[in-house]
Amino acid sequence: STRIDLKLNKNNINNKVINSSISGDTTQQGLNRLNLVIKNNPDIVVLCLGGNDMLQVVNPNIIFKNLDIIVKELKEQNIIIILAGMLAPKEFGIFYKNSFDNIFPQLAKKYDVIFMPFLMEGIALKKKFLQNDSIHPNKEGVKIIANNLYPYIKKGVEALNNH
């Protein structure tokens, strides 16, 4: 969130950024904490959940259901949502991969939210941008994610200003 803060400030966008993410969170854990996020009265939420569910091979229907509830509740609060999608590696098998990969575009279409198709674009499977676990981004990877995410956040801020 610090990188996003700096980028927003550099572009004269002075919204406050609150990082409510917890490393390792699943969609169920995100759903359990949703009321805490809503209590902060955010104008915009960047929703980046689902990757940890995938790593635990959680049924895509459950992931969809959890994210669906989260997006629905955020929408009911008139919060602008930026949904960051994830993609399953082919090692998970074609059925799981297809089911998982379709969750995010389906939700984006259903709720008409700002949609970033793949949060890890440009860094997934590239060791130089990943921590030793080959999953999470390192500092350089985080920079790339922040740069990739920025246009979507800018779109969210513009939508907020047009409210």
Predicted regions and their residues:
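A short beta-strand-loop structural module common to alpha/beta enzyme folds
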Residues: 11-26
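Alpha-helical cap/lid subdomain in secreted, periplasmic
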Residues: 3-6, 10-13, 29-163
